[in-house]
Amino acid sequence: KGVILMTELKITAANFENEVLRSDKPVLLDFYADWCGPCRMLSPVLHALAEENSSTLKVGKVNVDEQTELAARFQVSSIPMLVVFKDGKVAAKSVGYRPKAEIAAMMEDAR
C-alpha cells in the first residue's frame, strides 16, 4: 500500500487562523456540503489543482454544515463557494461550479 498524501486540508474554526490566515502560500478554500451536487462535482477538480500546485498553494475544505461560524463569517449563502486568501486577506471569491481553467486563472490572479 502506498502513502496517501493529504492534498486538501479540513479547515475548522480551530485551525482557520494557523492554516489560512497565517499561511505563507495562497489558500483556496472550498465552502461545501456533503449533500450538494455541484460541490461533489467540484471536488475532483480541486483535488487535481491541489496535487498539481502543492508547492505553491494550499487547498482547504470547509463543511458549512459543521462549521457554521466560518460560513457566517464569510457570508456563505450559496455553495460551492471558493475563496482565495493571500497574506491573510480575501483576494478572490467565486460561487457555483467552475471549470478547472477558471479556478486556476483565479488562483494566478491572486498570486
Where would I find each of the regions flagged by the language model?
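Short, Lys/Arg-enriched N-terminal segments with co-localized hydrophobic residues
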Residues: 1-5
